[in-house]
């Protein structure tokens, strides 16, 4: 589904019955979360709250929620068309494109080179276009007008310490870098013009800030936060885009049109011209604050830690902006649905590097990425362990995967009954368990003994080959195909 911007996407979702307008007043304090959570768990539409209130005070802008509440809407956001509701095939095609761009194979001859040329031409033609004026700068708040209380920012859970900006697309650029980094980092509201930027040390924004501090000690670091962006750009920020391709360029490929950018009014950072709201400001070195606690995608409240403070100098927006928001909680939530959809993008990327992989699955119940199940065409003893370590190190997205289960290709890995059968019949607890200590772990994983550092486990649930066992290995029970066909033919007569 091709679209121009977030508003065009909303219109098309509504035409498909994938968006519901809520005209009744709904409070951004807890009520909005409860409604969005019930609708998402039922597989319902995106929601546009037209009359948000904050503790009884009416807000001027509508709130968009559950935009990516189903994998089907994620596929639509990536510019794909769905045939008969099939969202997996189009997302696999996106993954195949990324795999090709990440590691393009040398052409096998002139004809092959000619066939691949349009792909490279399309990538080159999708370089972002800078414009001088933009809808996102139609209204400008500066000085005393900057007040985050004027935005309908959600307070998601009873134990949350303050309202939280959840879908902020954070734009940064490190010193000497041409390419900007886009990342999604939550932001706790401290005051009318200050929020806490919760980015983990290995994330792109944090790395840009670290490099800036080393190169320009004592100078403020420019940051822009986009609230309400076209879906392709948001998804580009959470997709493993090759380093040779900018997220803005990838978004253009998905949308089928160049991403138009406009320079921020107070810095050289560029933001999507069609954005709804943009926060412009700086992070001052040494300016930090205690962040949290907040309910997170784990289903728990996270511990309190120090993170940099983002001071907002200016807020620019459309004349009638839409505030884009979400909540995170025990799966299923919107991040879980995103993870379910991106799972299909990951499969071709993994298969390009490891052709023996048949399928790969990140169960939503595993908090999007903490547990992975992979099936392989096993070729030699120890093969499963090679695949485990390959997955842990292949994409940044898998750095925090705590558990990997490897099975043979006769196991349907998206059926837990099949996976549990393989685990209980093909695993010896000592021989087939791989434990790796002192590895990077999600900061939010309170089960690890040290913040951001913990252990990983791999389980080899494949059939064992000579060299892996000295015993005769069991053969699965399978009915004779001729008998099955004969019973199929008589089935109606049996009255069963």
UniProtKB/Swiss-Prot annotation:
Protein name, as recorded: 3-octaprenyl-4-hydroxybenzoate carboxy-lyase
Cofactor binding description: Binds 1 prenylated FMN per subunit.
Any one GO BP annotation for this protein: ubiquinone biosynthetic process
Localisation per UniProt entry: Cell membrane
Cofactor: prenylated FMN; Mn(2+)
Molecular function terms from GO: 3-octaprenyl-4-hydroxybenzoate carboxy-lyase activity; metal ion binding
Binding of Mn(2+), residues: 181, 247
Lyase as UniProt keyword: yes
């Amino acid at each position: 589904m091709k679209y121009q911007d977030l508003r065009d996407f909303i219109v098309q979702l509504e035409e498909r019955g994938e968006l519901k307008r809520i005209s009744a007043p709904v409070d951004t304090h807890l009520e909005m979360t409860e409604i969005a959570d019930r609708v998402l768990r039922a597989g319902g539409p995106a929601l546009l709250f037209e009359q948000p209130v904050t503790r009884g005070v009416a807000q001027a802008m509508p709130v968009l929620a559950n935009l990516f509440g189903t994998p089907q809407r994620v596929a639509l956001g990536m510019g794909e068309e769905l045939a008969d509701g099939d969202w997996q095939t189009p997302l696999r095609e996106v993954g195949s494109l990324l795999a090709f761009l990440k590691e393009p194979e040398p052409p096998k001859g002139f004809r092959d080179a000619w066939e691949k040329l349009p792909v490279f031409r399309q990538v080159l033609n999708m370089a972002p276009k800078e414009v001088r004026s933009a809808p996102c700068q139609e209204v400008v708040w500066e000085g005393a007008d900057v007040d985050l209380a004027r935005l309908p920012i959600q307070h998601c859970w009873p134990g949350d310490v303050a309202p939280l900006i959840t879908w902020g697309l954070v734009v940064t650029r490190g010193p000497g870098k041409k390419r900007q980094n886009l990342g999604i980092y939550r932001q706790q509201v401290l005051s009318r013009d200050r929020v806490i930027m919760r980015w983990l040390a290995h994330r792109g924004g944090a790395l840009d800030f670290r490099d800036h501090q080393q190169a320009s000690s004592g100078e403020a670091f420019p940051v822009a936060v986009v609230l309400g962006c076209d879906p392709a750009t948001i998804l580009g920020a959470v997709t493993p885009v090759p380093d040779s391709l900018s997220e803005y360029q990838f978004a253009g490929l998905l949308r089928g049109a160049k991403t138009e950018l406009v320079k921020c009014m107070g810095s050289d950072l560029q933001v999507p011209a069609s954005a709804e709201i943009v926060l412009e400001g700086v992070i001052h070195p040494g300016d930090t604050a205690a962040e949290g606690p907040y309910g997170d995608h784990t289903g728990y409240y996270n511990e309190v830690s120090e993170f940099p403070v983002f001071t907002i100098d200016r807020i620019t927006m459309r004349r009638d902006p839409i505030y884009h928001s979400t909540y995170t909680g025990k799966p299923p939530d919107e991040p879980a649905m995103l993870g379910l959809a991106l799972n299909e993008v990951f499969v071709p990327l993994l298969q390009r590097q490891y052709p023996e992989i048949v399928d790969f699955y990140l169960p939503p119940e595993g908090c999007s990425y903490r547990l992975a199940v992979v099936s392989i065409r096993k070729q030699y003893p120890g093969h499963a362990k090679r695949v485990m370590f390959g997955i842990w190190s292949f994409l940044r997205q898998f750095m925090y995967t705590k558990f990997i289960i490897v099975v043979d290709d006769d196991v349907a890995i998206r059926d837990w009954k099949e996976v549990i059968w393989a685990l209980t019949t093909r695993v010896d607890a000592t021989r087939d368990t791989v434990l790796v200590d002192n590895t990077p772990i999600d900061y939010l994983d309170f089960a690890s003994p040290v913040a951001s550092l913990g252990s990983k486990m791999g389980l080899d649930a494949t059939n064992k080959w000579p060299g892996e066992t000295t015993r005769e290995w069991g053969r699965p029970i399978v009915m004779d195909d001729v008998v099955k066909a004969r019973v199929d033919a008589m089935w109606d007569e049996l009255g069963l």
